[in-house]
Amino acid sequence: MQLLFVHDFPVEKYKDNYYSIGFSHKIWNRYLTIFDKMLINSRVKNVDNGEIINKSNGEKVNFKTIDSYKSPKSLIFKHKKIFEALTISIKKSDGVLIRVPSVLGFIAALICKKINKPYMVEVVGAAFDAYWFHGSIFGKILSLPMEYLQKNAVKNASIAIYVTKKYLSNKYPCNGKEFKGISNVQSVEKFNKNLDIGNKIKIGLIGSTFVDYKGHNVAIKSISNLVNEGYNIELEFVGDGPSKKFMEMAKKYNVENNVIFKGKIYDKTALNNWFRNLDLYIQPSLTEGHCRAIVEAIGNGVPTLASNAGGNSDSVNKEYLFKPKDVVKLTKLINRSILSKQYREENVLENKKNISGYNLENIQIEREKALLNYKKIINDFYLAKGINKNA
């Protein structure tokens, strides 16, 4: 049986192959334990060469990218081509797995409902927040329609997988069967680092600097406060960038020499080493589903502070959380973390207890239960049409 996976992630195409940091071929093994092969519908970006790493297509996995779709603005002039391309993929596949929030995913859900085809969803974030806090006027305009589309896409699904334990399932209930707390973390490290702090304090944050919802502005303002108090701080941003907006903001707050834009870190070992060289990890997001970067930071033994947005409280204890945009509280938490080794040790110990439940084997068992439930629904759907997919 072929499973179609639909999501907006931008895969990079070089010659006849496809590459992605977040969606390497290894990711698809989550689903290939139950389904025979996969077809992927996503956005695409053609590249000449560059960082050709983390191949996504391969054995049992093929791509049919939606070339007409670049951003939500593409819907204005190319909606017909986008709908046609998705419809072809949906009809030629036995099952459809939609990851939301995503525009392609919302469209795929509408098509499935129209042709009465059962589909399942993976809910990894909140649509309204993702668009409202994106940083553009167009994003704010789209936030309510996208929230409506996500609520309906999830409600009408046969099976829903949620990456959080409560937050997303409460926000987006499903009329079908729900599977909660199916984290999308790829690995959980078990590293104990030295928590001593030297003269220079290294603080890290992961997230694209081309969107506002990862809270880079909150981090810059907070670091500015601490630098003004006399601390020698280096704030490192990992992810797409640098963006002109946050470079100018760092300059405005007189911390341009304290803020380092490191860009993407493709290699997993290099990323773990980056974490282990930090004194503190912060995630001041305005919205989150289940933040993998937080789990990776905690697993690498880094004291971690985060906003209480979305599912962050699944991983980070209440004492180390602050409200989104609360620069004052974040500044106080960082200050206390710097001054007290005991506080840092308690942070790591308590947060590690929270992520100890992310046993990858157990998560995969639960994911496979969801996939098997969906596979049975598909079989029943085709048997009602006189087609035996197991023959």
Swiss-Prot record:
GO terms for molecular function: glycosyltransferase activity. Pfam families: Glycos_transf_1. Pathway: Capsule biogenesis; capsule polysaccharide biosynthesis. Keywords: Capsule biogenesis/degradation, Exopolysaccharide synthesis. GO terms for biological process: capsule polysaccharide biosynthetic process. Gene3D superfamilies: Glycogen Phosphorylase B. CDD domains: GT4_PimA-like. It comes from the Bacteria. Required for the biosynthesis of type 1 capsular polysaccharide. PANTHER family: SULFOQUINOVOSYL TRANSFERASE SQD2 (PTHR45947:SF3). This is Protein CapJ. It comes from Staphylococcus aureus. The lineage of its organism: Bacteria, Bacillati, Bacillota, Bacilli, Bacillales. The gene is capJ.
